[in-house]
């Protein structure tokens, strides 16, 4: 348990930040699910549209440190590859 005022404040801040980051991670997952669903359906246009909406969100969360930048790059690369395979 935090005993000093400074430590109590850090606990409050960490709780707030953790909740906010959890919300942002959930948002990323929602965008990724939409891309995934469009790819599995085989719909190139829908997959491209969903991917184009998801990329800026993924990049923004990586910049903020919500997810690691390599994880963001991995998601983008894999989905881009899958979308290109739909067109071929």
UniProtKB/Swiss-Prot annotation:
The keyword Ribonucleoprotein applies. InterPro entries: Ribosomal_bS20, Ribosomal_bS20_sf. Residues 7-20 have a biased composition (Basic residues). Residues 1-25 are annotated as: Disordered. The keyword Ribonucleoprotein applies. SUPFAM superfamilies: Ribosomal protein S20 (SSF46992). GO terms for molecular function: small ribosomal subunit rRNA binding; structural constituent of ribosome. GO terms for biological process: translation. One of its GO terms (cellular component) is cytosol. Keywords: Ribonucleoprotein, Ribosomal protein, RNA-binding, rRNA-binding. Belongs to the bacterial ribosomal protein bS20 family. Binds directly to 16S ribosomal RNA. This is Small ribosomal subunit protein bS20. The lineage of its organism: Bacteria, Pseudomonadati, Pseudomonadota, Gammaproteobacteria, Moraxellales.
């Amino acid at each position: 348990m935090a005993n000093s005022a400074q430590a109590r404040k850090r606990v409050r801040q960490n709780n707030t930040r953790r909740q906010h980051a959890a919300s942002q991670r959930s948002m990323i997952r929602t965008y990724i699910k939409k891309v995934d669903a469009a790819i599995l359906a085989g719909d190139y246009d829908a997959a491209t549209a969903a991917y184009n909406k998801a990329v800026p969100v993924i990049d923004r969360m990586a910049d903020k440190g919500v997810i690691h930048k390599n994880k963001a790059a991995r998601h983008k690369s894999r989905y881009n590859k899958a979308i290109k395979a739909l067109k071929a």
